Amino acid sequence: MKKLALLPLALAGMFSATAAQADDGLFTGDVRLACEAVLCLSSGTRPSECAPSLKRYFSISHKKLSDTLKARRNFLNLCPAASQDEKMRQLVNDISNGAGRCDAASLNASLMVWNWDSDVRIVSNAMPSYCTAYNDNAY
């Protein structure tokens, strides 16, 4: 009978130990992916460890570009470090406006001007302001 009375206590001890072990201070879920995305999109290289967070970030898509950019900014703001100071808030804003839109292929497509009179296509060399902010961010 005493063994049956101790069973709930043993089970409770096991589950509390498991819960304490799971709370090791590491982020999980979208918070983890958001923090990883901030790090990956802030660096000049994209290692393979960035794939899940970048996939999640770039999978955010809405009908209007402004809605997509706002949703991506909101996703990055899930990371607690994203709002630690004004420079980080500006970095998140610059990332959400520039990431995926400032590579060579995107710029060539968006900055191409076609002259229908002479059938000549010209790519402007003026960098958009969102790319300048993204590339020149203090972080």
Question: Residues of each region from the PLM?
Answer:
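Bacterial N-terminal signal peptides that target proteins for export
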Residues: 1-7
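Bacterial N-terminal signal peptides
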Residues: 8-14
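Boundary of Sec targeting at the N-terminus
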Residues: 20-23
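Short N-proximal segments of mature Sec-exported proteins
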Residues: 26-56
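Residue-level signal for mature regions of secreted extracellular proteins and peptides
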Residues: 28, 33, 43, 72, ...
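Active-site-surrounding "flap" and adjacent substrate/cofactor-binding loops of secreted or lumenal enzymes
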Residues: 52-74
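Low-complexity intrinsically disordered segments
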Residues: 81-139
